[in-house]
Amino acid sequence: MMTLAAALVFLGMAAQKPVATTVPGDPMATQCYTLSNGLKVFLSVNHQSPRITAHIAVRTGSRNDPAETTGLAHYLEHLMFKGTQQYGTSNYEAEKPLLDTIEARYERYRVETDPERRRVLYHEIDSISQLAAQYNIPNEYDKLMAGIGGQGTNAYTSTDVTCYTEDIPANEVDRWARIQADRFQNMVIRGFHTELEAVYEEYNIGIAQDQRKIFEALSAKMFPTHPYGTQTTIGTQEHLKNPSITNIKNYFHNYYCPNNVAICMAGDFDPDEVIAILERHFGSWKPNNNLYRPEFAPIKPITAPIDTTVIGQEAEFVALGWRFDAGNSLQIDTMNVVAEMLSNGTAGLIDLNLNQPLKVMGAGAYSDEMTDYSMLLLLGYPNEGQTLEEVRELLLGELAKLRAGNFDDDLLVSVVNNNKLQYLRALDNNRARTSQLVNAFINHVDWAQEVGKLDRMAGMTKNQIVDFANRHLLDNNFVCVYKRMGVDTTEKKIDKPAITPIPTNRDKQSDFVRNILGEQVEPIHPQFVDYSKEMTVGQTNKKLPLLYKHNDLDDLFYLGYQFNFGNTADNRYGTALGYLDYLGTKKMSATEFKQRMYKLACDMSFNVTDNYITIWLSGLSENMPEAMALLEDLAANAQVDEGAYSNMVEAIIKSRNDAKSSQDECFSRLSAYGTYGPRNAYTDIMSAQQLRNTKPAELLALVKGLRDMQHTVVYYGPMTQKELDKCLKKVHKTKKNLAAVPVGTPYMEQTTPQTEILLAPYDAKNIYMMQYHNEGTQWEPEHAAVINLFNEYFGGSMNAIVFQELREARGLAYSAAAYYRQPSELPHPEYAMTYIITQNDKMMDCINEFNNIVGTIPQSETAFALAKESLMKKLASRRVVRTGVLNSYLSAQRLGLDYDINSVIFNALPGLTLDDIVKFEQQSMAGKPYRYLILGDEKELDIESLEKIAPIRRLTLEEIFGY
């Protein structure tokens, strides 16, 4: 018989059981919970594959950084991967006094101004860090996630959010929850000075990106008395070099509490089981009843345009911004609709009036929702000879049309319909679901309000839009930032610190990790694609090859016409198909065509690659026949517009020249040049002279002729095959005897018979570097398992050798990787590559370390077993669904296969040993000649040491770009 005391305990426990709330009409069927400690939980079920996307969102970001240590929220995000009192260490009791000493030294270091004294203090920090490192077991969090089959382990920080992301097998919720509960309650700051250096490398990447500069400058003027404008998420150079562990701890204890956190999950699970697990592991997490969030006085309205300028070496552009209310304001619905009425990529005012007639190089409208305020932004890139001031006036002119109601009556309805289409597509993706949940939580948007957004949009009228624009989007209440080309003299060079590499201790394992990974869970059995069952390979009634898969989940369709030739056969097709974007037909102008397609909520795209041309149509199935007819009419009857062609050519030429100012673009071209040689996908293009001399009618003839060439129809949608045949017969009219497609000469990866260095110029504080080795080895299916396992072990994750040695142990880079690449198509060969972005004066450190670990691969049975287990769990829980089945089939065909290669990999993995991996690496990578591809500022590099490796061949931008 139950005693009174026991009954009271039972009733108390029952009262603690979280109760779900739902919102009628929610397409995601989200179940919302609040635990007794204030922790929010949002669960959305999606049974497509046995995996779960799990995001843990903390309602804090750089907005709440202490003013004297900006960047703190972001580098706390990094430190959350360093372990707890239970893992990441072999002896926390012995480690803690050393960590406390490091903290105290940093408090002295950050206020010290004497350079010599700072050097001595940093040396002390480095020395004590060596003592602490004997207990440190780096990457144990990553090992835990790998061990349970996690993938996509990451995090991000912004103004108002710090979010930790995972994608786990559906059978691993309990172990994931235990790990996270410990992580969020017992985080320990260790490996601090090497991780901080990795953050600084991330800062170096950002300073070469002018879009970051313009956003920061715009925010500074838009929010002059608020942290959105007075500080940045990455932090200042000075603050990053003078951090405070004490401030980080205080920040963590204040904001990382259950009443300031949400767990957002989407995937294959039973909500009742999941909430019970979360209650069990997170329920004892103590709330912060004194949670402090700084508040700031309202910002004064902008009553006159505020102009500012930033300097950088990338292409010029202009940005305009208007300030709006908090992210949970109903005003934001209208702001987002207005942004899409201005620019949606197809039929917005800016799309039709500026982009299509090429009155500017490119322009668009974007919205940015934040917790305290939001923004609507307009961006514009000038044509050759056009000033930024002229672009600004053109953008303001489109706003004037909005205020005057000078837009098509169907535009608002079309925007709403396309939002519904985008929402429907997003339901297919677990990450999209969790991101929506996270954003609502961070911005204090009630879930019922979020669910009702589309209905509220549907209820908007043209008069409301016009009134909104006249109240909020004026020609005197905005900020304007001009991004001009030049040398930014504010960027300072800081020499690398003297860091003694910390030991990786990769064979050590904490009891916590050993116990967690030693547990047995009910396995998920793999399901590989059986193409004979999952899809139909057949013919249309016109004898066209057909790849068909029925969509029984929703009303979306994807229709493609694939031609088995591409740029290698005729490099004019990309330009020809791009030209269609500016043309109309005898029946419709270019503007009318785009408006009609957008109203149908259908998208049309052309994809020209090395060896394939694909014309894609997608959207709502009920509108597919009309969208097909529009596409066919455009391809067959597009009207030549000489002016549009001339403008397009000049825009292409300018965009090519602008690309030379981008660090990312320059490295992409150098990588292609070093891999394929002077003839590659970037350089095998129509020259400026060819573009100018070509008659546009010739290009339209190419497009018109496509329909009469051999091609394959690819379809995923709700139509039956018979219905599709009928539709194709009526609309997609082809000749009885189709012409053969032209044959191209493929761009082939070059072999590397000797070591050499290719150096291309770019003025930046860091280098981009790739090492490339290719013996011309032909790929075989039997190679796939050992290659995939090698990549998992050596260079493919945060738990891999490369990440541990280059970033964790030495702080040499933010981004580093190494892979043995498999081809996507035969007869292309396999090849090896490494990749890193690092500060200029760390170049030789990176090269030497890469050469060390490639020359003699570090061996760890523990790490190998974990890599194998992780890869097998990922493959077992992987499901290929929807259009993925068709894409998987096409990929297999290009490798000469008629089966899912993952089945071969999975079945071979159990028999592979560490010796197999070592042997493979020694045969394929160690001691081989490599081609070093380095993009950087030569005067900042150790050229003397480089020349000891191999002769340097200096390339010009003209050589790697081909023009």
What is the predicted role of each segment?
Residues 38, 47-96, 320, 330-342, ...:
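Active/ligand-binding-proximal structured segments within catalytic/core domains
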Residues 1-17:
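Bacterial Sec-dependent N-terminal signal peptides
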Residues 23-58, 534-550:
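Mature N-terminal segment immediately following signal peptide/propeptide cleavage
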Residues 46-48, 57-61, 84-85, 169-171, ...:
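Solvent-exposed coil/turn segments that connect beta secondary-structure elements
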Residues 34, 92-292, 326, 356-517, ...:
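Charge-rich, well-structured scaffold segments of protease-associated domains
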Residues 204-207, 220, 290-347, 379, ...:
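His/Glu-based metal-binding/catalytic segments typifying zinc-dependent metallopeptidases
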Residues 46-49, 257, 313-314, 372, ...:
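Short strand-connecting beta-turns/loops that link adjacent beta-strands
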Residues 17-29, 522-534:
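Short acidic, Pro/Gly- and aromatic-enriched capping/linker segments at domain boundaries
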